[in-house]
């Protein structure tokens, strides 16, 4: 894949994740078990994506100014970046489990935890808009 395709795929992945978070936040406000299960299934598909190919060397905001918000720190701290990604996937698994159990309280708590993992990564590895 060329650089443009990689950047488009990376952006599409994170946009789909953001859209999923927004939808689940809506579901959590007035918990609907069936809607939660449907959103959890969508989240599960998103989180099954192998994101490693979306972060090839040479695709940071330093390399491609104005084309991406991915900081160069990702590539100099790949182990930490990977750990943050794993934390997101683990929190996502908690959201999915709570949704499938129909547990509104656990769903809300897991969703907050998932949002926290997004913020933790953005704080270190995403350029400010």
UniProtKB/Swiss-Prot annotation:
The terms under GO molecular function for this entry are: electron transfer activity; heme binding; iron ion binding
Residues involved in heme c binding: 10, 15, 68-69, 118, 121-122
Q: Biological process (GO) annotations?
A: electron transport chain
- Keywords from the named record: Electron transport, Heme, Iron, Metal-binding, Transport
Can you say what this protein is called? Cytochrome c'
* Post-translational modification note: Binds 1 heme c group covalently per subunit.
Annotated effect of mutating residue 76 to A: In strain: M110 and St Louis
Q: What does this protein do?
A: Cytochrome c' is the most widely occurring bacterial c-type cytochrome. Cytochromes c' are high-spin proteins and the heme has no sixth ligand. Their exact function is not known.
Q: Which organism is this entry from? A: Rhodobacter capsulatus (Rhodopseudomonas capsulata)
* Pfam families cross-referenced by the UniProt entry: Cytochrom_C_2
Q: Does the keyword field hold ATP-binding? A: no
